[in-house]
Each structure stands twice: as C-alpha cells, then as structure tokens.
Amino acid sequence: MLVMPAVGTVMNVVLSGLFTSLTITLSHQVIISILTALAAGILIATSVRVVAILNSIGVVLELLVLLGAAVGLLFHQHQSLSVLGSTASVQGHGSYLWPFLVVVALVVTQLVGFETAGAFAEETNKSRIKPSQAIIAGLAGTALVLFIFDLALLLAIPNVGKAMADPNMIPDVLTSALGSGFAKLFFAGAIVSVFSTAIATLATIVRMIYGMARNGQLPGSGFLTKLSPSTDEPLGTILVAVVLSILPLIFIKRIPVIVAAITALIIIPYILVFGALLVRRLQGWPRSAAQFSLGKWGLPITVAGLVWTVIILWDAAWPRTITNPHLGPLPVIEDLAIGCFVIGLIWWFASLRNKPDPQGAAAIDQPARE
C-alpha cells in the first residue's frame, strides 16, 4: 500500500514538467496523489483484462517516449563523454566507489514498476513460466533504455554546474534541446506511463491482499474475498487497498519523507524473499526439473541479489534531515519498520501461529503442471 503515494508523487513531478506555469503546492500534491489512487482503483474494479491492456499500453509507451527522447537528445550534445568523470567543481573526499554504489542503488527504484507490470503475465496459461520471462525482459529492456536516456540527457546539459542546482533540470534540458512542444509530448506520454504504473502497482497490492485473505491469513477474510457478481472482482479488497494507500498522504504531510520511507520499506520483502530462497538453495532446492530455471546461476544470482538489496536498504535508511528525520525516538523509517514488525508479530501470535500451511511445505518442490 505504501508504494501508491510514491507513484502519486511521481505523477506530481510529471505534471509540473508538462504545465511549467503551474505552481504545485503540498495540498495539490496530496490531492493529485489521492485522485491517482482512486482512479486506479475504479479501473481495477472493472476488469482485470482491461487493466492488463492499459498496463501493456503504458509500458510500451514509456519505453518509446524514453527512447525517442534519448535519440533526440543525442543530436544536441553539449558535453563530451569526459563529463561522466567530472565532479562539476564539487569537492570529493576519498573514493567515489560508495557514491557510485549509492546512485546505482537509487536507480533500482525506477525498475519496480516494470517488475510489477511483469506480474500480469500470471494471467496467461503458462503462469509458472511467463511471469519470470516477462519480468526479466521488462527489467532488461528498461535498464537498457534508461541507460541510453540518462546518458543522452547528461550529454545534452549546456551547463552541468547550473543544472545541478536546477530543480527542474530534466524539463529544462528537454525544452532547451528539443523545444517546448516535444518536451510537453514527452511528459504527456510520461503521464500515461506513470498512471499505468499506478494501476499495475495497485493491482498487485490487491492480488496480494486477496491471496492472503483467501488463505485465511488476514482479518476480515470473508469481506476481502467476496467477489462482485457483475465484474468478478474483489471490490472489498480493492476498497481496502485504495484507503490504505491514501492514509499516509493524509496523516504525513512531508511528501519526501513518505517517499523515502516507501523506498526503504518495499525493499524489506525482497530481502526476506532472497533470504528464504538462499536457505532453500543451500538445502538443495530445486530437487526436480522446472519449466523455468536459472540453472547453475541460481545460487550466485541469489547471493548477489541479497547483498545488493541490503546495500539499497542501508542507503535508504541512512539518517538524513530531509528524507529520514527524527519524528519520534528513532528516524522515521526505523520507526515505521519497527511498527510494521510489531503489528505483524502480534497478528502472527494471536491468529496465525497455529494455522496449518494452506498448501503444505512440500508444494514448493512440486513441478508445475500447465
């Protein structure tokens, strides 16, 4: 649920680039984020097929917009490749390895939407194969296109020193190089792609809540699993997901703090999955042939993924006045993480501890049947 405020924040950034004369205040940011969540919830309540189509359109459009802008920027270079090693007169201290790792870690957050979009491949007949293939293809394509766009954008900056102090650096560079018309077209396409990301993100949240409720892992499972007779969608789950996505925007007015907390907290499930997967692999899993497999690369990729996500979490949770301030006894990210852990622990002891595994521990070793 915490991801949706971040998506709404990105929508505010895109709108400010499209309407340069518009001054977006904090109230505007909250309202736009809430409207984005509501609109996504309404669309999800109609049909999962409609959502999948809109998601596909958004992914393709975003890649085309980024690639088109990158090609255009490459024809308006103001910098040479040597700018990649320039500090723009900023004094460095020690090795640049750690700043480089921090920047790369932050770029990972740009890939979350495409990974979420790949989850819609579960709606195909080969649900054990297609999601993995779609996610890998989506991440690889996104990484390549983002690399080209970021490189082209950096080379097209007229003055790197001034750009570093410009809060509207991307719109200004696009307008300077390609004209206001193309810049607005770029951000118009970005609005569609960001909204499709909002739909994909909320749909994934709904699917997660519904799946846990169906297995009796959440309170109010009867309400959460009740399907609409007309659309066959879990309207109760959709409503809960939208409301929980909006609540952080209402109670926390510091948008950068919300985004930073979201960035950190969404990394924790990845670490848990990687950790559990590493234990299983060290125990010899998988013991049978699978239709999709990483083969001998499975263990090293799992270790590398676990180490990298820990680095990302370490960076996101670092105490900072702007993004991770002390709003309580601890920095806000640590406060939220501990709060979520305590609530989950209480629920586990109160309700889940004695419940049997709905599928059985051996189910994970069974080959998929399509």
Q: Which residues make up each language-model segment?
A:
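TM-loop-TM module centered on a large, flexible mid-protein loop between adjacent transmembrane helices
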Residues: 16-22, 90, 134-199, 218-258
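Inter-helical loop and helix-membrane interface segments of multi-pass membrane transporters/permeases
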Residues: 8-36, 41, 77-100, 318-331
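Hydrophobic transmembrane alpha-helices that form the core helical bundles
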Residues: 1-37, 41-45, 191-208, 254-264, ...
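Helix-loop-helix junctions that connect adjacent transmembrane segments
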Residues: 22-28, 56-184
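Hydrophobic membrane-spanning alpha-helices of multi-pass integral membrane proteins
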Residues: 237-246, 272, 298-316, 339-341
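Membrane-interface loop-to-helix entry segments
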Residues: 28-79, 135-140, 259-272, 294-305, ...
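Terminal cytosolic tails of multi-pass membrane transporters
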Residues: 277-301, 319-370
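Transmembrane helix-loop junctions in multi-pass membrane proteins
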Residues: 43-49, 181-182, 241-261, 282, ...
